[in-house]
Amino acid sequence: MTNSLLFDPNTYDPEHIDPETRRLLRALIEWFESRGKKRLIEDDLEAVWPEDFLEFVKREKLFATFPTPAESAGGDPGKRWDAARNAALSEIFGFYGLAYWYAWQVTVLGLGPIWMSGNRAAKDRAARLLDDGGVLAFGLSEREHGADVYSTDTLLPPPPGVVGVCS
């Protein structure tokens, strides 16, 4: 049971969340804890690309499970946009390091315009990329009226030969 207002990986147990989400959150904590504080700090200070973290995300389908709306989940009840689950995941990422939180947050921000659009093909593609372990991002700049993600439908294809990641 979690009784503290502060995150403690030793006692964290979000009892208000479904069992599969709890399993994923515990698996994430165990992944971080298995690295140890020393390695996490060294990786942060050396700005190490979190490739092993992204492999874990891909294997556990974290970014496919947490930020995918039910309508794009292909009938999988575990995949849903749920603010309580997403907040719990964000708290864990924030506790262990900015690089991990940043990969999550950039993905969430990149998904916003896609999920809000009426573009079914883009939604299906985003869901498929997330299921394949992709990390997404979105950037938009307009001279006329600023970055207006609500009224702009934009498709940014990856460079030739790049699968699942746009740079």
Task: State the predicted function of each range.
Residues 153-156:
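Hydrophobic/aromatic beta-strand elements that line small-molecule binding cavities or substrate pockets
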